[in-house]
Each structure stands twice: as structure tokens, then as C-alpha cells.
């Protein structure tokens, strides 16, 4: 039985808003529906949420579920990174679609920096990530997968996630199973874990789903089991 990635990784929306402007953005629709901020194209920082990092029970966190790291002001990033350093019990993930706008170094052991790639024409983002974000851990999310990315340079990448379009737009986009399998094979040849998101079940088949996590994330999940919520 496939698992939902949201059960493994918790959203912590410290920044809400994004300037990228994807036509299929679920975050923008949610913000508009619940009126979280006035203008989604003008990101806002919510430092009060940093207290969530102080909890002792380990957790895997995604910090850019409602934003893009490229839209964070440097001072926001510095404040968040400082808090991450104080809380090594957690693992933290960041995503961007504009790695070309980033330029920083970090030695954080529990921070993972990734790019979203939806088509072959966006493969440059992986190279830009490695060049512009000098970090310990990298990941790539191939979602929603619009076409065959072909041969991908995954050197230095520590995890990949593969998924397709969800929601109202899902009927307009069809991800071929061969694309997902090609990415999986390329990653596995380099020893990179692969997580197929649950929306691939109708395409891949539940019995064929591969849902692997980095060892650091698995350790967090194992420790969680010994804690009472």
C-alpha cells in the first residue's frame, strides 16, 4: 500500500507567497481561498512559526510549501538557518524553481536544498542548484512531470521525488510510466533513493510503487515511533 508523502514530511509555512507565477499553483489558490496574506505575489515572513522547530520530537519539515526559496529575503533565510542549526533533531527541506537567483554557502547538516523540474527544458535548474547553493544535501522533485526529461545528470543529488499533476488540471496532463521508470533507473544506478508520490498509483500501479526516503529522514521517522504525540 502506497504512503502519502505528507505523512512523512510536515509543512511549516514560515514564508507565504511566491513570485514565480506558475499557472497550476495550488498554494496560490489556497492562499486566496483562506486569505492567508493580501498578495500572494508579495511573500510575507512569519517568524513566530520558528517556535515549531523547538519541539524535541524529531520531524521532517518542508519549509517552502507555500513559497519559493528564491523569494526569501536574505535576512529571513539567515534567521531560519540559525534556528535550524539550533535544532539538529529535525531535517529541513527547501525547494526552488529559480536556483539562478540564489547564491549562498551553508554547512548545515540537516538542511536539504532542491529544485523542481517539470520538463526537459528545466534540467538546467539542477546544475544551477549545485553551482549556486553550496550545501551538504541536494534533492530534485520531478513534479508535475510534463514530458520525458531524458538523460539527467544526478551527480551529487541525494534524493529524487517523482509525481504527476493533481487536482482540476490532472485531466489535461498525462505522465507516461516510462518517464517515471527512466528517472528511477538513473537514480538507482547512482544509489539515490526515489520516492514516487501517491498520485502515480493509477499510472504505475500500487504494487509497483517505489517510495524510498533518505536514511536521515528514515531515522527521524524511527525515533518518532518511540515518542508519544
Name the predicted role of every residue range.
Residues 86-92, 134-137, 184-194:
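Structural alpha-beta junctions
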Residues 72, 142, 176-177:
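Nucleic-acid endo/exonuclease domains
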Residues 1-9, 146, 151-229:
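Auxiliary Fe-S-binding modules of radical SAM enzymes
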Residues 67, 98-100, 117-119, 144-146, ...:
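Active-site-proximal loop/turn and secondary-structure-junction residues that shape catalytic pockets
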Residues 118, 122, 173-176:
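Short capping loops/turns at secondary-structure boundaries
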Residues 1-112, 120-134, 149-154:
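Conserved Radical SAM active-site core
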Residues 79-82, 129-137, 174-186:
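Long, well-ordered alpha-helical scaffolding segments within enzyme catalytic domains
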Residues 61-63, 92-94, 113-115, 138-142, ...:
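Hydrophobic faces of well-ordered beta-strands that scaffold small-molecule active sites
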Amino acid at each position: 500500500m502506497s504512503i502519502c508523502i505528507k505523512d512523512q514530511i510536515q509543512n511549516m509555512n514560515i514564508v507565504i507567497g511566491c513570485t514565480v507565477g506558475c499557472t497550476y499553483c495550488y498554494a496560490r489558490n489556497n492562499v486566496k481561498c483562506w486569505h492567508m496574506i493580501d498578495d500572494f505575489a508579495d511573500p510575507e515572513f512569519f517568524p513566530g512559526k520558528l517556535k515549531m522547530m523547538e519541539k524535541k520530537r524529531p520531524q521532517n519539515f518542508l519549509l517552502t510549501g507555500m513559497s519559493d526559496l528564491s523569494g526569501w529575503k536574505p535576512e529571513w533565510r539567515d534567521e531560519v538557518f540559525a534556528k535550524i542549526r539550533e535544532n539538529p533533531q529535525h531535517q529541513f527541506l527547501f525547494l526552488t524553481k529559480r536556483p539562478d537567483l540564489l547564491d549562498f554557502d551553508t554547512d548545515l547538516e540537516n538542511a536539504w536544498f532542491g529544485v523542481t523540474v517539470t520538463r526537459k527544458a528545466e534540467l538546467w535548474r539542477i546544475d544551477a542548484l549545485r553551482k549556486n547553493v553550496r550545501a551538504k544535501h541536494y534533492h530534485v522533485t520531478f513534479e508535475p512531470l510534463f514530458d520525458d526529461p531524458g538523460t539527467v545528470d544526478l551527480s551529487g543529488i541525494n534524493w529524487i521525488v517523482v509525481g504527476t499533476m493533481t487536482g482540476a488540471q490532472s485531466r489535461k496532463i498525462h505522465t507516461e510510466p516510462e518517464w517515471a521508470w527512466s528517472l528511477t533507473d538513473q537514480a538507482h544506478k547512482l544509489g539515490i533513493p526515489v520516492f514516487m508520490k501517491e498520485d502515480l498509483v493509477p499510472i504505475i500501479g500500487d504494487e509497483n510503487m517505489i517510495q524510498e526516503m533518505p536514511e536521515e529522514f528514515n531515522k527521524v521517522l524511527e525515533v518518532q515511533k518511540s515518542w508519544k504525540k
